[in-house]
């Protein structure tokens, strides 16, 4: 599903989308439904036989300014709209209302297993702590963060790698919205 939605997101926002397959994801095993591959409407053969050049798509000055304006006015809002409409990021709620965990999608199984060891989740994915799973980490959807964090005293960010890009962005989103939810992440968790 992530691959299919990634391609759809790319088309909806006219932006390249990257699917990151990390070591942790590559070592997971199990069963999942698949779909047939879909051939592209425009093939390599088409590109060779009927090349189309749009010099405005080449990112060199002065076109770079135009590209930046297009990103802010068109592509970014289109990506956010697509993410929200297709519910690509996931929310898992529970009885705990005053705190939650925000995590990257690829870390879901590891976080759930850690919660299970602590007695805060079961093997079937039922967590006693609300989870906001970011299956798309860029762009972040401000409205989803505001909804998830409203009324919560604290938030733990589980972010892989360095630096703490997501954590910094969440701070900015919440402070601009005047939400005083405390945000913790790299200060509580190992640095790598």
What kind of feature is each model-predicted range?
Residues 2-192:
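Flexible, low-complexity linker and terminal segments
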């Amino acid at each position: 599903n992530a691959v299919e939605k990634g391609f759809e997101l790319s088309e909806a926002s006219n932006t390249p989308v990257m699917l990151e397959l990390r070591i942790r994801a590559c070592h997971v095993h199990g069963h999942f439904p698949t779909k047939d591959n879909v051939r592209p409407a425009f093939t390599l053969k088409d590109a060779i036989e009927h090349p189309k050049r749009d010099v405005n798509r080449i990112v060199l000055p002065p076109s770079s300014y135009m590209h930046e304006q297009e990103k802010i006015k068109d592509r970014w809002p289109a990506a956010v709209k697509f993410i929200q409409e297709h519910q690509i990021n996931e929310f898992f709620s529970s009885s705990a209302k005053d705190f939650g965990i925000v995590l990257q999608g690829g870390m879901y199984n590891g976080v759930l297993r850690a919660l299970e060891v602590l007695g805060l989740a079961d093997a079937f994915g039922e967590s006693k702590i609300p989870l906001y799973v970011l299956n798309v980490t860029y762009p972040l959807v401000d409205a989803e963060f505001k909804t998830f964090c409203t009324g919560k005293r604290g938030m733990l960010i589980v972010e892989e790698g360095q630096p703490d890009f997501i954590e910094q962005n969440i701070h900015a989103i919440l402070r601009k919205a005047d939400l005083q939810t405390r945000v913790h992440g790299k200060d509580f968790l190992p640095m790598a």
